[in-house]
Amino acid sequence: MQPAALLGLLGATVVAAVSSMPVDIRNHNEEVVTHCIIEVLSNALLKSSAPPITPECRQVLKKNGKELKNEEKSENENTRFEVRLLRDPADTSEAPGLSSREDSGEGDAQVPTVADTESGGHSRERAGEPPGSQVAKEAKTRYSKSEGQNREEEMVKYQKRERGEVGSEERLSEGPGKAQTAFLNQRNQTPAKKEELVSRYDTQSARGLEKSHSRERSSQESGEETKSQENWPQELQRHPEGQEAPGESEEDASPEVDKRHSRPRHHHGRSRPDRSSQEGNPPLEEESHVGTGNSDEEKARHPAHFRALEEGAEYGEEVRRHSAAQAPGDLQGARFGGRGRGEHQALRRPSEESLEQENKRHGLSPDLNMAQGYSEESEEERGPAPGPSYRARGGEAAAYSTLGQTDEKRFLGETHHRVQESQRDKARRRLPGELRNYLDYGEEKGEEAARGKWQPQGDPRDADENREEARLRGKQYAPHHITEKRLGELLNPFYDPSQWKSSRFERKDPMDDSFLEGEEENGLTLNEKNFFPEYNYDWWEKKPFEEDVNWGYEKRNPVPKLDLKRQYDRVAELDQLLHYRKKSAEFPDFYDSEEQMSPQHTAENEEEKAGQGVLTEEEEKELENLAAMDLELQKIAEKFSGTRRG
């Protein structure tokens, strides 16, 4: 009877509770919870062996417990934000350089702080109150979801921007990259975690439009706080220690920098830098001094976080110092925000002056200094070489000592090259003239290849004189080069000119000079040029020398070569015969004169004249053969002249 009475009493209480609830509120979760409570009680009273809680009821209770925990977390975060906003003095109206947008934003931010303080006191009472209607709840959840999506998009954009800035910092200092990347990753992960917590809190605990508005304002303030925390070491880099005159920084700096300075900084009890910039102190000093009470407590709670922040600040300061000493003028001008050139010159480091004095002591020329400046700029674009010298305290001295060593190596390399050239000149003086020309041409080819890689900054007149001398040296053998090239191309498709002959000289020589030179060497006139081709007899005397020079030519060129020597000899004989017959046809008195002929020739001629009356058949055949040979020689001569004209 007792269990039945208890069950009846329990049913009556449940019916009374359900009937007392308003009809408009249809909360499915509460109905499921009451149903689970009834089932648990009935199972415990009726069946002693049955499980006390079914798995569906357990899931429902877990969900409710999670929601309660999330609500408590969100309330704790709200109270923390409200305490920080109340702790931070609201003196934005005193700053004269702020924009109207930021004034309105901060004024709006102050209103929900009051609302948060009022609502924060009664947050415990409101947690137990039943929420509004289901339509209002759906509207709130949609609004909170859209807010969470917008915040996530903004967070992704902000992280991309931060990664771009971090990449530029890492390009300037790649040396001790591991510590910096670890610190930057830690820095990038903290705002993401905070934003995820805020978005979860928005989606799960939607309590009312008024409370969601206040929470939005507080989350915006927290986002500004995280941005100001992450921009703090970058501002340390942007504002050097020796920079004074904050009035000029307020006038010259962009409005974005002003906004960054005027944003509230909740970084472990730091105060805003607005008052410090108005009173005339640089913002770096105000940021570096931490509030005593709060900072000691926070350091005691989070020692690892503070140590990482201090190391990051020291490392950023060293990187800034090194990059300011090494960066070219345009980069530093952009970093200082459009300052005048005089002020930028005043900020030069003494290490640069010591480097210039060291260069003067070594006796380096200004051209070399200019080349060194270009190389330093290219090294900066690539990023400095990794090494421990940038992380050490004496990083500047180590970096500049390595630069000095490279300059000394360059200087020693130039002296060694000059000594080698002088030894080559001595050896060249002892060689015969033709072999010296061959060596000069090979050296010129090597110099041209080297000149394509590195142009020496010498006197251009010296280069022109050297080029002129090389051209004149090549002209000495230009005519027979042309002859050999023409004959080789005509007779052999695999013709390859010798390596020591320069087609560059033939291209660069004017046509009139080579034409007149060939005329003078052959002793021919312009009229004779039309009748027979140019021929140089000295070339056959110099041919053995060419064969000696190119003794490994067939081995170096695997292309099958025909017997060019035999063909060249045959063509030379034909050319000689043609030359003689043309001359004899044009000048019979010159070739048939008695002075040119020996007494034996005169006796033979007299005998021939005496017996010239009747020709035999053999003599007629010989004459026909000679006539045919003459025709062939004339055709060959026409081909030669045609190839020369073409």
Curated annotation (Swiss-Prot):
Modification sites for Phosphothreonine: 79, 92
Taxonomic superkingdom: Eukaryota
Residue numbers of Pyrrolidone carboxylic acid PTMs: 476, 567, 634
Site (Cleavage): 161-162, 275-276, 278-279, 324-325, 629-630
Post-translational modification Phosphotyrosine, affected residues: 374
UniProt keyword Membrane, yes or no: yes
Biased composition (Polar residues): 182-191
Keywords assigned: Cleavage on pair of basic residues, Cytoplasmic vesicle, Disulfide bond, Glycoprotein, Membrane, Phosphoprotein, Proteoglycan, Pyrrolidone carboxylic acid, Secreted, Signal, Sulfation
Pfam families: Granin (PF01271)
Biased composition (Basic and acidic residues): 67-90, 119-128, 137-173, 208-228, 340-361, 406-425, 442-451, 459-472
Disulfide bonds: 36-57
The family this protein is said to belong to: Belongs to the chromogranin/secretogranin protein family.
Function: Secretogranin-1 is a neuroendocrine secretory granule protein, which may be the precursor for other biologically active peptides. The 16 pairs of basic AA distributed throughout its sequence may be used as proteolytic cleavage sites.
Protein name in the entry: Secretogranin-1
Organism: Bos taurus
